[in-house]
Amino acid sequence: MNNQPIPSSELIINDDGSVFHLHILPEDLADIILMMGDPGRVSEVAKLFDTIELDKQSREFHTITGTYRGKRVTALSHGIGTDNIDIVMTELDALANIDFQTRLPKAEHRRLTILRIGTCGAAQPDIPLGSYILSHISIGFDGVLNWYKDGESIFLMDFEEAFVRHMAWPSRFARPYFVRSSEKIIEKFQDWTVKGMTVSAPGFYGPQGRSVRLALTVPDLIEKLEGFEFEGYRVTNIEMESSALAGMARLLGHDAATVCLAIANRHVKESNPDYKPLMKQLLLRALDTLTA
């Protein structure tokens, strides 16, 4: 693959030279990327920028690049789920490391710094609403990384085996994987965040132990997650993207991690729908930390 042009069927480039889903050009992308699920939140981030050079949207993918405290930053929405992360991470890496004219990898690798800001449900009774949880480790229930050949080279196999035993993991489920976030980002953010081991679920309801009208395969999911502890880590929260983000970044040679605002506590069954002021504070603090 490294010596042959990537076929157009595998990497689709639009007529205007932009990458297929994100619809942005290689020159549109900054080295520092702040990602979030909600396209509308990108506009809120942009209000904090000093300057704005571009604003593009395609489907759920909203991109604004500008400057913050003298540094170029891209704010980008990824939509919901690890399947979207597979698209976004592949296309971000292509923008950074594939020559769109020759369709060959560039001689010099460009390393991106990617922070995802999201919301989550806390999985421990002692984590209060409003906490900022940094995913040191992510647990993928989604199976996305199992489709990439080198995935096992980054998996934390001791964690995985202990977790499968503890959960009595159903054989019909995709095998869970554990992956560590960027040490560089962890070092920058660990002073003001909760040390997290985060579950990325392939859905919001059943896969996170929520039952509305359908019975669950694992009705005691939250209780089982609360009880898992390994090498000083416990399951802190549940969301839907961090595992694929951290894993694909490691495989592709980028730095990535997720910080989530806890807007619900699944154990004590509390939630805070009025979380937007806290989210704004998180976005501002994240920008300050990324650009420091």
What do the predicted segments below correspond to?
Residues 2-177:
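Metabolite-binding pocket within alpha/beta catalytic cores that recognizes anionic/polar moieties
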Residues 21-26, 202-208, 280-288:
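Intrinsically disordered, low-complexity segments enriched in small residues
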Residues 121, 138, 199-206, 244, ...:
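Glycine-rich beta-alpha junction loops
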Residues 158-230:
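Active-site rim beta-loop-alpha module in soluble metabolic enzymes
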Residues 222-232, 238, 242-248:
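A short, acidic, amphipathic alpha-helical segment used as a generic capping/interface helix at domain edges
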Residues 243-275:
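Zn-dependent metallopeptidase/amidohydrolase metal-coordination segment
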